[in-house]
Each structure stands twice: as C-alpha cells, then as structure tokens.
C-alpha cells in the first residue's frame, strides 16, 4: 500500500486528489498539508474535501507529514514546491509535482533535488494531454517547415501563470520536433504592425475567463489545409487521476526526474 500526502489539501486540486485516492486501490492518504495561515488547519481533510471524515487533520508541518508518507503529491507554486522537495529529499521519499510556472533557475533547482529522489514533474497529469504531446511531436516532424505552428490555450480567470505550463510543453515538443529553439522562435504576443509572420515562428496565445478547466489546441497551417489537435478538460478529476496514477508508479523507482510520458509508457 502506497502512503500518500497531499499539499494544498483544502484547494480545488487537493480536494479532488484526496477524493481520487479514496477511490483507488493500492494507495491511502496519510497526510494533508496547507500553509501556516490557512483557515482549514486542524480540520479533517476528508470533510474539507467533501468525501466524509477520514481522521486526518490538515497540517502545516511539512516535515512531520512527509516523514510518514511514501510519496508527496504537490500542486502548489514553484517556490513552495522547491521547499517541499527539499523536505522530500531529506527523508528520501518520492514526489509527484503538478505545479507550473517554474523559471529556468527554479527548474535547475528541481533537477538538482531530483537527483537524490524519484520525482515525477509534469505540467499536466491528464492522460489525454500526454498522448496529445506525442501526437503533436509526430505531426510536427511529419509536416516540417511547410506548415506554420500556432497554439491557443484557455483557462479559468483565477489562473496565475501564462501561458499555461501545458501550452509551454506543447510548444517545446513541437519546436524540438522541427529542430528549433523555442526561446528563439516563440511568439507570445502580437499587437500592432507586426509585419508578416516569420517562417520559423511558433505562436502561443493565452485566453482567460470564467471557470474553464483547461483547453489546448495546436494548429498546423499549410497551403489549402490545416490540422488541429485539441484537448479539452471538463473536470479536475482528469488531473487528479493522473497524479494518483503517477504516485502509484513512482513509489520504489530509482532516483531521477520522470514525467507522465514515463508513467504511461509513451516514450
């Protein structure tokens, strides 16, 4: 039985992860974490998540919670995630990271810590999105420079980072497939007299509004035709289910940085 702890336990994602853990064989919740000033501290994690009393209080003591778990599932923010990973490393546990918005320096810190532990990090835990990554790479390789690559992502109005981590990963995968460096060819804003589109450009545009869970579309524009690859998430359970699948998979794995492509056998 894999023993899991969940950060952001009173949040939207944390609550869904706790619910999915309760419905999944082979894994159990042993700890729930929130920040030190959160209103839900001391409350039962199951009751806060809407799944009934579990006998597990929400705590801000990351060290104590991680110590009794096998794997930490973390959907927070980059700086918080790095602090939590340091605790995971201290206790030689495993981690599943769904946080997004990491800077280059922060990702280097994550990689450094992950050299000591087994850790999954993925901007999107959805099975469908991870299959989409593979399809986008294959389409980009096949269509090559004859097709223009653009993408649009939409999320709810409360999302803090833009573009989404998923959109950035899709853009990176497409760029790699056609031998380009996204940092050189990525276009994240167009306004005014921009001139003709550059042949090597990869456009990534962001929309925010309402309660959209997450929509991503990658467009391949050719002459006289276009290909669209779209994924729409209608429930956070798709991410929670992937995270729990990852937690089951990562337990006992050798130290290193993995992603959902590894979990799903898509590499």
List where the protein language model places each region.
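Short glycine-/small-residue-rich Rossmann-like dinucleotide-binding loops
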Residues: 70, 76-77, 100, 206-208
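Short, ordered loop/turn segments at secondary-structure junctions
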Residues: 35, 100-102, 124-126, 154-156
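Extreme N-terminal starter segment of soluble prokaryotic enzymes
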Residues: 1-4
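Residue-level detector of anion-binding/catalytic polar loops
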Residues: 71, 94, 118, 148, ...
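Rossmann-like NAD(P)-binding element
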Residues: 63-83, 89, 93-94
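Rossmann-fold NAD(P)-binding glycine/threonine-rich loop
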Residues: 82-91, 98-121, 130-139
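C-terminal substrate-binding/catalytic lobe of Rossmann-fold NAD(P)-dependent oxidoreductases
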Residues: 7, 12-63, 144-267
